[in-house]
Amino acid sequence: MQQQALQAAAQAYSTNVLAKYPWIDQGFLVPDPVPEELTLPFRELAQKYNFSALLAVIAQFNWWTGDISTIPALYGIKGLGPGLLRSLFGEFILSANGDTRAIYDAAAGVLGDSVLLDSDVVEVKRDVKIDEKTTSGVTVLVKQPGGSHKLIRARKLIVAIPPTMENIASYDLTANESALFSKFSALGYWAGVATVHGLNTSLTNVGAQTPFNQPAIPGTNGFNSAGSPGDFLVAVGFQDTDYTEEDAKAVLVKNLATLAAVGAVPKDAAETVTFPYVSDHKPYCVRVSAEEIKGGFYSKLLALEGARNTYWAGATFSGHNSALVWSFNEGTVLPGLKKDLGL
């Protein structure tokens, strides 16, 4: 019965929503004027087109989205474009060896010493003379591990980090760029591996009294087996970026204590859990308000592509999905970059 409801909701969603916005997997290519329904709370759009049964699924597969019921519909739709919808009812494409880093490791192997890992960007200038032939290029000054500095000169720059004002404080921003990027806000997302000895099965956190069964926030989506005994993939969501690693760990410890009290995990799980691998992904889901979307924010943002020798990429411009990131790169960034370089 539940599967039938999901399939009916998926059909309604595909027919009434995705068919109208075929660009959804290619980036935030929002038309001007902006369709009003893209700025509605997502639950209202779901009610309008009878696909409410999908919202819990979208929240689960896009952890952490923010409150799936209240986020602007544009962001909810980005969480379930045609590509992911086909995979949900078909098959997912995975790395053959299970290592999602493989493509990046291979790229690093090709680039060799040109990859400056663990370096800090000190200063970025994007409309400067770099040599006798290139009167308008970019320079990037970076501080490397150990304290040494390196100056990079190039014709063009691709920026793939979340473009929050904090992240790009070292850039020579124009008034227009500052005005746009200062509109962004972000969620918090902390992930890692938790070792819980004696726990032998995955656990999913389902909100019994929350909209569309979302976990209470700050909270985790569960403990998912990492493939080795006692190791579980964990992720903690926050409403903003004002938290510490200890705050994230405390959420998981509290969850384990609650589970231990009802016998779902070993009784000492909260006291003995360790976190051998952790990673803080904030700022996560960098977004703007429905009012900004309505005012044509994404058309203005897209107009920055190629300006001042700079191309912008990454999840902020495409969505938190590797396939979407690469689709935007191939459809927008690379064609523009190659044209500018005369390739």
Listing of model-derived features with the role each one plays in the protein:
Residues 118-120, 143, 313:
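Conserved beta-strand termini and adjacent loop/short-helix elements that scaffold enzyme active sites
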Residues 18-132:
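Active-site/ligand-binding neighborhood in enzyme catalytic cores
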Residues 1-19, 31-32:
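Dinucleotide-binding Rossmann-like beta1-alpha1 core, especially the glycine-rich loop
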Residues 154-156, 164-330, 336-337:
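C-terminal segments that line or cap access tunnels to active or ligand-binding sites in enzymes
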